[in-house]
Amino acid sequence: MVQQGFSIDLILARSREEAADGKDSMSSRPHIPCAPQPLPPNKYAKEMPRRKDGQDVQEHSSWSLGEQGKKLQYSSPSSAALHRSWGSSDDFSSVGSEDDSTEGSPSPMRNSQETETDHRGESPKSDLQRHLRTAFTPQQISKLEQAFNKQRYLGASERKKLATSLRLSEIQVKTWFQNRRMKLKRQIQDQQHNMVPPPVCYPQTFPYYPGVLPVPLNSGSFYQPPAHPFQAPQNSYIPDPRFIPQPLPHHIRMSVALQQQYPPLGLPPGRYFTGLASKNDG
């Protein structure tokens, strides 16, 4: 065995050599990041490789000071590389399994797109069938109009007879009658809307006083409405019952009896002159 000295110079020289060897190894080794680079967002981003404890794969490096000097210590990259390769293999296997599953089972997006294309392909045909209208001949229209003027609602037997006579189907006849009824309803509504209601004339009623002879309406004794709605009435005349003569002459009594027998328009018989007759009888 070769005995080595334990002098300070030998220890310092040995530490310098080890530090130089460490620098050379650092320059020769590839750079390994402490944390993995983030992957671009994709549909498999949720299935990142994780450890059992739930933490991402990370690499740690530590620096420690020894008794003889500063020594650079690195964690062995073999375990990290193995772990990374294991995670990448799992990732690729998961991607492959998903691809196989997607190829084996049709996705809902494809099903929805196929159904939409099917509906789009069928929609023009249905629209054409819906918008097809029956072209009636003038003879058919005239016979249908005659049947409609006689009866607006047809029974099953009558509709069948009419359809066979016109060489039409029962559905066509039924549809024509429905449209004709709607047309008639619109015409009636338009006529009612365009019609102007005639002016309503109400009979003028005047208070009756015993002993007063009927006065013509064109005289100024009764109140007449003003010509302008904002014009105030100038004068009005109401006879005073104190100046009515008592008892009444015979011809006035006869007129009272006639008025009781034939009352004015819109008034029940015996409503007026009852008080006057009782006075005269007394």
Curated annotation (Swiss-Prot):
Biased composition (Basic and acidic residues): 17-26, 44-59, 116-128
CDD domains: homeodomain (cd00086)
UniProt-annotated location(s): Nucleus
SMART domains listed in its UniProt record: HOX
Keyword set includes DNA-binding: yes
InterPro entries assigned: HD (IPR001356), HD_metazoa (IPR020479), Homeobox_CS (IPR017970), Homeobox_NK-like (IPR050394), Homeodomain-like_sf (IPR009057)
Region feature (Disordered): 17-128
Entry keywords, A to Z: Developmental protein, DNA-binding, Homeobox, Nucleus
Tissue: Expressed in the ventral marginal zone of blastulae. At early gastrulation, expression begins to spread to the animal pole (ectoderm), and at stage 11.5 is expressed in a gradient across the animal cap, with levels highest in the ventral region. At the end of gastrulation, predominantly localized to the ventral and lateral regions of the closing slit blastopore. Also expressed at a low level in ventral endoderm.
Main location: nucleus
One Gene Ontology MF term: sequence-specific DNA binding
Domain notes: The repressor activity is mostly localized to the C-terminal region.
Record's protein name: Homeobox protein pv.1
Organism this protein belongs to: Xenopus laevis (African clawed frog)
Gene coding for it: pv.1
